[in-house]
Each structure stands twice: as C-alpha cells, then as structure tokens.
Amino acid sequence: MLTLLLVALVPVGYFGYPLASTVLSLNHGTVAPGSGSLAAPGGAAPAPRGTVTVLLMGSDERHDKNGNVVAGDVAHSDTMILAAVDTDRKSVRLMSLPRDLLVSIPGYGPGHRINEAYTLGETNHLQGGGPALAVRTVEQLVGVQIPYYAVVTFDGFRQGVDAVGGVTIDVERPITDHDYPGDHFDLIPVYVPAGRQMLNGERGLWYVRSRHDDPMSDFGRNVRQQHFLTALSAKVLKPERIGQFGQFLDIVKNNLRTNLSPAEMLALGNAMVGTSKPRIQSYAVGPDLVRDPTPRQFALYGAVLIPNKTAIDSLVRAFLRGDPPPGGATPSPSGA
C-alpha cells in the first residue's frame, strides 16, 4: 500500500535521478506520467514553506496475471493518510483519516463517506480519476492544498513486504477477523496471534487491514498501519538491505499510481539525506475528533462518523507545524 512510496523516497535521495526515473517509469498504465501537481481549489491554503503534502492511498484494485485490472472490479481507497514531508526538519508527518468520515465530495455534495470519493472518480471516469477527486475531497476537509497523490495496490504491499523478508511487529492483541475481505469478492477468516513475530506480505496485510475484531475499529487499524509503516521503513533503509532495493523498486514501479515526477520524487528523497532513519510523526483524526450520527443521520447515511470541524482544524495546524496534537497527546516519532 502507501508504505511503498514513503519507503522509496529516502534511497531515491541517495541514488539520484536515474533511480527516481526507474521508479516512475510507465508500466501497464499504473503510473500517471508527467501529470504534474494538481490544481488546488480556491478555498485551500498552501502548506507552510518547506512542507510538501502528499495524499497516500491504499487501493483494493486487483489485477490478473498480465497486470490488467480484473473485469468488473470497482476500486476503493481502503486507506487514506495525508503525508507532510518537512524538508527543513528532515521528517515525515502522517495523519490518518477514518474511512467512514462523513464529508462533502466536490460535485456530489454532502452526505458521503470520505472513501467514496476515490470510487466515484474511478467509476464515473472523471478527469484525474479517483485520486484527483479524493485529493479535492481531503483538501476541502483540511483546508490545505495537496498537490500530489500516490496510490499503491494490496498486491504491491504483499510483494514489497516479501521482498525485504518480512517485517517484525509486536502484535499487542490477537487479531481474529471472520469477515476479512478476500481477493475474490468473498469474506475469509484470518488470525494473527499476539506477540513479537515476523509478518510476511500476506499476514502483514491482515495486520494493517483488519478492523472487525478491533475494539477501536478503524481507529485501531489506523494505529496499526502507522506502526507497520515505521517498522518497514526502518528495515528497508538498513545499509545491509541496499542490495535488495532494486527488487523493491521493481515492485513499487509495477504497483504505483502517482503524479509525482522523477524530479519531484528525487527532491523528496533528498529531504531525508543526512539522517540514518526517517523521523516519522503520527497523527490521526481519532475518536475524540468525531461523534456518532444522530438517529436521523444514521437512517440517512448508516454508521458514519460526524467530524468535529473545529477540532480537526486544530489538529491540522499542529500537523503542519510538527507540534504535539491538541489535548496534550504527543506524536509518535520513529527513529528519533
């Protein structure tokens, strides 16, 4: 998923423009070549100087053995994380957005879950497709321009994790999900025991994607996603792993859809040069920033989350500055 792009940025800074070109070369139409940054809507403000915002999405789009999208498949943005690459502090900040957040989607009006934007853009063949509409929707929510996006498939996630030999994670509580969405439009049971363990690509995907058994539901899943991202980043960027990076890049290239040009990707990678590990700070639109729907809202929209716009605005300000989230909680740095 989105992990692949973020992990790829740092070595690109070391190895240079040819490597960035390799990552972003066109393959099976999954990369948007030379599309450049998206035009921002009138109400969104630019990010602070030295900060580049990228909307990272994990897509459940499936491909056959020839790399073509499975006929009749409708892609969804199963994961949405807003990334802020701070070129001055050499750090990356990540803000998770819950998939059931009730928002207004440009051109479609209010009353939609935020993850519907990607699907609407894809199925209606809008300019820029699902990524562009998802970006405009998030810009409208947070009030900040997001010029770039990156979408990575679940297949890419599995292959990327396997390419580095798996990732060690301390699973805090066992994951038992009897309704996990499988690859063939079915629901399958999955289980990940508690404790420190090596997760391969398949089990890693279970860990970051399952939410039905988590008492915090999507909020708990968002925390697990950021933990996994941090652990994978640390493993990929170890000096002894440099020899495996070519294989990792091939996977990124084949499973990435982005409007970042090679030069732009190089610039983001260069932002991390000089630090042995990327400093990653975690933020989230958590349960304290939303409320449950009223009975009328539930009847209209189902089990959605109603955003507290004032509280989210405060979180976004802290996120862009790199300050602790409002309320005294501290971002979770990695590699500090």
Locate predicted features.
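Non-catalytic, solvent-exposed segments at the cell envelope interface
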Residues: M1-A336
